């Protein structure tokens, strides 16, 4: 007998699938950073995979959607800031801030304005990061690596936006 899709089940599926997408993206970044031999981003993305597994358990077992979503927004900001500082603006990690700003449609909070606050936080981070990182990076990347990061970030960001638009 198929399960009836009520609002609680719908929220559960949305957040579970978003978290699974984040696990897949960070696993991909873990592999990529390992192949490119970038130690700090490799370690960060391993920790991110573990973080998102924890968020998946938080959603599946405890149904703590608001806490999980809040922590995911903050993790995304940390991810983008760290990787942009390390690899520069042209690696396009900032695209994830734009993708996450589109998540205002999912509101596990009591107040409908909280997702908009997170979107504003993402946009502020975007502009501040742009202003602070122009011409500064901690590592110079070969052009092929920079292009690969740009393609991966574009793909991951568009995948996130398309998922949000689809559900």
Description of each model-found segment:
Residues 18-21, 44-47, 71, 114-115, ...:
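Physicochemical signature of membrane-embedded alpha-helices that form the seven-helix bundle of GPCRs
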Residues 26, 52, 57-59, 69-95, ...:
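Hydrophobic transmembrane alpha-helices
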Residues 14, 93-94, 158:
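A generic helix-loop boundary/linker signal
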Residues 8-65:
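Hydrophobic alpha-helical transmembrane segments of multi-pass membrane proteins
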């Amino acid at each position: 007998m198929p399960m009836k899709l009520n609002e609680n089940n719908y929220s559960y599926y949305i957040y579970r699938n978003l978290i699974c997408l984040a696990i897949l993206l960070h696993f991909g970044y873990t592999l990529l950073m390992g192949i490119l031999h970038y130690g700090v981003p490799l370690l960060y993305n391993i920790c991110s995979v573990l973080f998102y597994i924890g968020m998946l358990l938080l959603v599946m077992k405890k149904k703590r959607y608001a806490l999980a979503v809040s922590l995911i927004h903050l993790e995304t900001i940390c991810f983008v800031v760290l990787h942009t500082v390390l690899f520069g603006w042209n690696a396009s990690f900032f695209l994830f801030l734009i993708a996450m700003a589109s998540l205002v449609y999912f509101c596990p909070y009591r107040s409908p304005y909280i997702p908009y606050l997170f979107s504003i936080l993402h946009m502020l981070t975007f502009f501040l990061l742009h202003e602070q990182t122009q011409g500064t990076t901690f590592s110079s990347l070969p052009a092929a690596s920079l292009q690969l990061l740009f393609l991966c970030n574009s793909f991951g960001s568009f995948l996130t936006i398309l998922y949000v638009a689809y559900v």
